[in-house]
Amino acid sequence: EYGLYVIGETNLETHGTWQKLGADGSDEWTLPGARPEWRENVLARTDAMLERDKNHPAILIWSCGNESHGGKTLWEMSEYFRNTDPSRLVHYEGIFWNREYPATSDMESQMYTPVADIKKFLAEHPEKPFIMCEYSHAMGNSCGGITDYTEYAYEEPLYQGGFIWEYMDHGIAVTSPDGKPGFAYGGDFGDRPTDREFCVDGLVLPDRRNTPKMDAVKAAYAPLKITLTDTEAVIENRNLFTDLNAYDLVFASSVNGKPERRAVLRADCKPGGTEHIPFPFALPEAGLACMTVTAIQRAALPGIPAGYEAALGQVWHNYAVARLTLPAPQLVEMDCNVGVKGEGFEYIFGRGKGLVSIRYNGVQLLDDTVRPNFWRAPTNNDEGCAEPFTFAFWKTAGLYARCDNLSAETKGDFVIARANYTLPDGQTLPIDFAIDGAGRCDITMTWQGTRTELPEFGLLFPLRRELTEVSYLGLGPRE
């Protein structure tokens, strides 16, 4: 009724035996492995699940379990599925770690493999289709890179998609001492040792309220891909059975976040097809101009009300900051500093520090030196992988980056100041500041290092405390 494809997985997980004390894959401890004393118990679970669920048409595939390594017993499970119900395929991820019985699974399956490594694996192992039985761990601030995986499913026929771990947070409803409702997890009850928030790893909260992660998933899983140029919407119908005419296509323009014009169109496009639809009106050439196209469900479906926004596409143009035809600002070179001056503004670069001052209309904007930054607050997933320890170098790399060389020159309508930074491990980072006659500054950072696992890549601008107001267009009310 809801159009879900399901893998029915046996209630079997023994990752504590093959990850004993962090040592993966030791047959000495692995269960069930090939131990005869576990065979009857494991096959009983297999039979119980199959008999319970065999008449559910949503189940396309049976799974032997999760994170239980490999061995003969798991292969016998897979054969039981095939012999009892030959209409369905069999899945098991553990054969990636233990190739002793590769026929256990009818498909290749892995967890949390980067897309680049999936491509490499499929180039070397094209014999079976491939799924990611877990590809995004939805704990804390996460799910930011899922489109790398979902888009690859449309590029590579062997790559059949994957599963997010997991749907919901597992927390216990509690009331705090000050009377506020909330959710508790491991460690909140004095339990030691504890896995803390490791079961709070879902797309929705324990009471099923959505999180911003669900918005990211909705966009990645949208039945339509809407790409906008300056003059038209290119709509790829990714539905398997539904025509594009099941949606109202709403074209809406805005300037600086304020609505301007709106039109509703309909178009025909068969499943799997692509339609090019010209804009019904031009994008305004003023301010921060945006064209948004949304696909709105016309008729209610099971679980989907009429009026539901199924997909969205946007294109932006910032006409508010279109370059003025002004001469380059004045470049002033001194022994210790380099200045860039124009009408109402000035920048000062310290030869051993980088950008130290920005003044607009006589007001100093900076409270300290602008510096590169490679660190951010660790997420729950970072902490689960011990990445704060692994990547701690990057915190000090930004704090103690050294500006070894500063050069400046006038090029056309710009003054370009280049600050060359050296990081504590000897890697270099050039940063170019291109300043025009209106005081606008375009910044280009070029990473030249060999290390690629940067937690963040950007600049910190310490602003004066009296600068208390900021105006911006963000990613929406839920971000």
Predicted features and spans:
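Extracellular ectodomain segments of secreted/surface proteins
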Residues: 218-231, 314-330
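Solvent-exposed strand-loop boundary residues in beta-sheet-rich modules
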Residues: 255-257, 299-301, 361-362, 465
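Terminal connector regions
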Residues: 283-323
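Short beta-strand elements of extracellular/lumenal beta-sandwich folds
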Residues: 230-239, 442-448
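Beta-strand-rich binding/interaction modules
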Residues: 232-267, 275-280, 287-298
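Beta-strand/loop-rich accessory regions of lumenal/periplasmic or secreted enzymes
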Residues: 280-286, 318-479
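Extended substrate-binding grooves/exosites of carbohydrate-active enzymes
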Residues: 1-231, 239-245, 250-259
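Generic detection of short hydrophobic beta-strand segments and adjacent strand-loop junctions
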Residues: 262-269, 275-281, 310-319, 459-461
